């Protein structure tokens, strides 16, 4: 009988301690509650959250953050697959999800060396386009994307990773064809709207 009483008392104390620990964890404010008062706090997400493929990740984002960044679905290779064709399907899913969940959306990114539209730098024969042609294509791309998301995206990562780690210009095709002023041009184009 003494062993049963001791065991019952031990279980009761353990469950009380566990309940107190769980209760105190529930009282810890979220990152959004603590820091979101002062600035945007967020995460880069893909369409797996809006598509319901990552419910655990979606819960974390909903609870902890007040802002989301489009990880891949708003990049040029995704939303501008052909010269005269845009595909905003995935970016729109993310924008819809952000609005539905009260999250500020940041667009990423308008000009980047790594994932531009495949056709951006070459003509139909595979030759590099002229400076004027690339400036026109960059203008067209930025204007169409920014116009499409106007009022839904709070801000844009306009030019991404234009510099190497040592501070020198990245020798991207934007840089090689247009020169360093491609950065200023991209910001001017994005700012027009």
Model regions and ranges:
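Short, structurally constrained coil/turn elements
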Residues: 13, 35-37, 61, 149, ...
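Acidic-and-aromatic substrate-binding clefts and catalytic sites of carbohydrate-active enzymes
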Residues: 21-22, 44-57, 76-89, 163-168
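Generic alpha-helix initiation/capping and coil-helix boundary signal
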Residues: 7-12, 36, 91, 183
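Short, motif-level signal for alpha-helix interfacial/capping segments enriched in acidic residues
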Residues: 13, 49, 137
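Residues at the starts of beta-strands that form the adenosine-phosphate
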Residues: 3, 40, 104
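Bacterial Sec-dependent N-terminal signal peptides
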Residues: 1-24
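Boundary/entry segment of secreted carbohydrate-active catalytic domains
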Residues: 21-67, 71
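Substrate-binding cleft and catalytic face of glycoside hydrolase catalytic domains
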Residues: 28-29, 63, 67-81, 90-193
